[in-house]
Amino acid sequence: MRTIGMSDYTVGEDCFTELPGALAEYGATKVAIIGGKRALAAALPGIEAALEGTDVEVLEARVYGTNSTRANIAKVVNSPACREADVLIACGGGKALDTVKTAAIELKKIVFTVPTICSNCSAATAIAVVYNDDGSLEGYSYPNRPAHIFINPKIIAEAPAEYFWAGVGDALSKQPEVEYATSAGNLEHTAGLGLALAHTCSEPLFTYGVQGLEDVRQNLSSEAVKQIALDIVVNTGYVSNLTNQNDYYYNSSVAHAFYNATCSIPRKGTYLHGEVVSLGVLVLFAYTGDTENLERYAAFNKQMGLPVTLEQVGLSEADIPALCEYAHATNEWKQGNPESFTDEKFAAAIKAANAYGHTLLA
């Protein structure tokens, strides 16, 4: 037996007006709101205004911390307000949302999400990333998918532009990773549906990405910003839920194996998830020998200011042996879809992608 649930979503600058009705569907009269400091400053006024005059009580609005670590997850789990609430409203980027989603497993709570940045698809997914206290990857948790997503393009447009930029970088991975991971064929219905939806993920980025980034840099809510937010949150989020089930995993591949391995490499600088993943996409195309897409995606990376070389994310070819070693511990390497990964091929792909990137910067 398989049951698939997908998040409802509301998009628009007036999206919070739908919040009371969405809560009523679950009989919810008590909520706790959890998020990052900036996220709460951006979203809380609109949420509180929407709930004013209703029978919904806000028990608490709390800052979760700065990363989705076990310590921060425990703070949510141990909060009396979060224990009493009918619904947890998670506001912020992926780390804030993943913290609340993971805490909700133990609390057995319904989660609504408010992505105040669109740096990844966490607002829609039944998967969450958990980090160690030092920032390295611990692994994944598998919560229920959020019940409802509230996407406010104005809030996203007024957030720091680098998160929108990195979100485009992360979303670039969804279509090629799923296409590669499923390329052995013989997919059952749910995975096949995920693959079909994955085919919709890249083109909106190529169409609206440059304009959307320009608009966000001017804090301008626009059609391009809305379309990118929908693609990052909804398209890629739905794909994640359909391609990640108990009996199969096609949700990520070489690009995320690369990213996850980089988390264990000590280096100067701070690099956003999607920033590094976008370089991992080039590694994926080098790995599969897809020169046409390597060149297309690399050109788009350059146009967007996303990385095309190792040096742009604080790495060098001297780090490749360590990247191979750390990649062994990643879920993507362990899953090995559509076939087992090899150190030799992975190392060669990193070198090839890096070499091609250098030709673009020459």
Residue ranges of model-derived segments:
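Short glycine/serine/threonine-rich phosphate/pyrophosphate-binding segments
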Residues: 16, 40-44, 70, 95-102, ...
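ATP/NTP phosphate-donor binding region
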Residues: 1-84, 310
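Active-site segments that bind and position negatively charged phosphate/pyrophosphate groups
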Residues: 188-299
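Generic secondary-structure signature for well-ordered alpha-helical cores
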Residues: 24, 52, 56, 135, ...
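C-terminal charged capping/lid subdomain of soluble metabolic enzymes
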Residues: 2, 18, 290-362
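A short, small-residue-rich loop immediately preceding and capping a beta-strand
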Residues: 80-103, 107-118
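A glycine/threonine-rich phosphate-anchoring loop and its flanking beta-alpha core
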Residues: 105-198
